[in-house]
Amino acid sequence: MSSTDGSSGGITRRGFLKGVTAAGALGLGLSGMTSTSGWLREASAEETVEERVAYTYHQAHCGGMCPLKCTVRDGRLVMVQPNDACAMDRLKTICLKGISEVQHIYGDGRIQAPLKRVGDRGTNQFEQVSWEEALDDIASHIKQAQDTYGKNSVVVTTSSETDCVFLQAMLGAQGRGNTGIDIGYGNGLDPSMGLGGGYAMSTPEARDWVNSKLVLTVGSNFCESTLPQVRLFFEAKEAGAKMITVDPHYSTTASKSDEWIPIEPGTDAALYFGMIVHIVEQGLIDQDFMKQHTSYPFLVDVATGKLIREHEPQMVVDEEGNEAPEDGQADPFYVIDEATGAVVPYQQTTNPSLSGTVEFRGATVRTVYDLLLDSLANYSVDWASEITGIPAEKIKELAELYAEGPSSLALGWGGNDKIANADVAGHAAAVLVALTGNVGKPGTGVGVYVGGTYNCHTAALGEWALPEDMVAAENEMASYDMRTKESNAHVLIAGDDLCQHYGNMNVSTAWANSLDFIVSIDPYFTEGCKWADYVLPCTTRFENDEEYGNIKNGYNQILLQEKIIDPLFEAKTELWIQRELAKRLGFENALPATSRERVDAILSTSEDEAINTLTVDQIAENQGVWPIEGAEECRRVLEDYAFVTDSGRMEVYYDSLVDYGQALPAWEAPVEITSDNPLRETYPLQLSNVRTRFQIHNQFQNAEWIKQYYRPTIEVNPQELTSRGLQTGDAVRVFNDRGEFKVYVNGNESIRPGCARMYELAMGDFTIEGNMQSVTNDTMLERGYSLMCGPVTPFSDTLVQIEKA
């Protein structure tokens, strides 16, 4: 065996290859794979070239799932194009990341052989081993841990980019649980409508924007992070929608909008409070919508803060065997009948009163709307202006435009979503929508519109069924809490870059070092691989050992993953890896014997007859795409106002949060980036993590073609450079009490003074030194544990200082 010692297991941008030994360790003997020198050669007129075309899909994490047409010449991928068999031109999507796969999948970021750690964790010392040795040892460690500590001593974390879908249940392992990522706004918004799953994925398609008079974008950068569907933004603009973007920085989307409104980071909720106050004061509310379709008329016990219901909610078992509280039909809420003044179940009147205080069952009860009016006494438009930095007249103008409607409120997974008070902003947005009725009608909606596949038409696909006794363990806690709280986690199998998923990397690496055993499964060497005991190379979407690999929902169509090329290097498919582990653990027969068997099951086990009668061969004959019924029309939500809540209405009063003073949203400042924080004297810059066209989270940082145009850089307003004696291009140290890293700095007028901006998840192999997560905030609010998806990780609720390195 040969060993490697480098900053990325032999595969970094700094040219890890330090000799024949190192190259051999990672299987880098393929000519031309580690540099561009072997890419081009003279063509011969007599040469016979074998060329074919096959079809697959691209990444899911951006929400694009672009259907791709791939040209293969002499066994090598040479061209990637949009799939021209898509039913509509708007579905034929691709971006520079998809095009770059021609180089990327052959790049030096690939893990080319199984690697075994030979040094301390994090020191990046590995040796190449055989698949047999790696899998035997991994299976042995799993058995040993489960025999000693129980099945749930194994924790399996995966992502949509690694297809290890059977592993958690197969092993009876824990999963990752709540993620703390992309759930800030949704935690506050989604309970009001019963949609979105905590991720604010509660919107119609962005195609619906053509019906809007106003598209108000807050904390989202649609034109940067949703490249495959960016035409929808311009179609709406051309149709007459007023496009307004609220963002601390002059973002790509702001630059394409009709108007940009700068805002102080972390103050979205204050903006909504200001708009709400003005809408109420000016009588711009939609009373009919409020009475018929919201919880504003519901009565609340003034003493307890609890909603009045017929009886204490009982737990019932649904058709799938899951326990849930009784809904509003079985245990109704109460309102005041405006005609009679009587307190009645909400279903028994079509004209409930929005205001009123009465005695009922020995308690003083008031309407939710009256309680809202009381809470608004704490706010004013001038107060909102002072907090947000937005002129009071602009807040009033924005409120009037929004109330006039039809308006779409486009939120995002950047901006305030990554700040500790994000749920308050989401809740305040729900209150704003419920006052104006800007939901359920053409041109209206609220939530995250980025990523076309997140809110489009989907097919009810099935999946290969594991034996009934093969089920995942219940999660003890979210994995971010495993870092600091006692758990039974001993073995971690990561199909994702787990080190990048948490703030404050020092805590993450300390946890990693405390675990008995870590396995990383990935096509590319990531930051998390450096702490693994074994690193296993899996294939990309372009490689397979069989004709077909998987079937997934794409953007309004079903997509088939065909084999484009053979697995590169020693990479194996995720199904092969899972089957080999299952074989060693005694349950190989539980998994599909072939990929074809699995993809057949994905269709045949669907409960939708249109899907279970469809065949893989039919999709393949249509170049790997199949239109979803109804996709020619824009997908909308809640058109009948049938909210998926206990009452069937839009519920804006959360009595589960009474103890935190947030039954109705109440202003709460960020935990670190407030202007009056004494830490500002030492660390004066708010560090914002934002998304970029150049990457999908941590992916594509090692894509050579893209790296020609971007390197990890911290951007600040030029006045921040001047005050520190810095110039664009200088290497700087970015630091706070948590840690530090070094990158280049760039002066950019579009960045708000007092702020710094970086594209998210800059890994240590691509910075000058260190990892971006070394400085980010990991404070979890106690209230967060009572929210739908647990507390948000406040990556952007972070203060730093920069100085010349």
Segments predicted by a language model, with ranges:
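Long, contiguous, secondary-structure-rich segments that constitute the structural scaffold
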Residues: 419, 574-619, 698-700, 704-715, ...
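Conserved short loop/turn motifs at secondary-structure junctions
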Residues: 153-160, 384-390, 413-420, 452-453, ...
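N-terminal export/assembly segments and adjacent metallocofactor-ligating motifs
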Residues: 2-288, 292-353, 364, 382-383, ...
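N-terminal leader/propeptide and maturation segments of large enzyme subunits in energy/redox metabolism
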Residues: 113, 117-133, 284-392, 564-651, ...
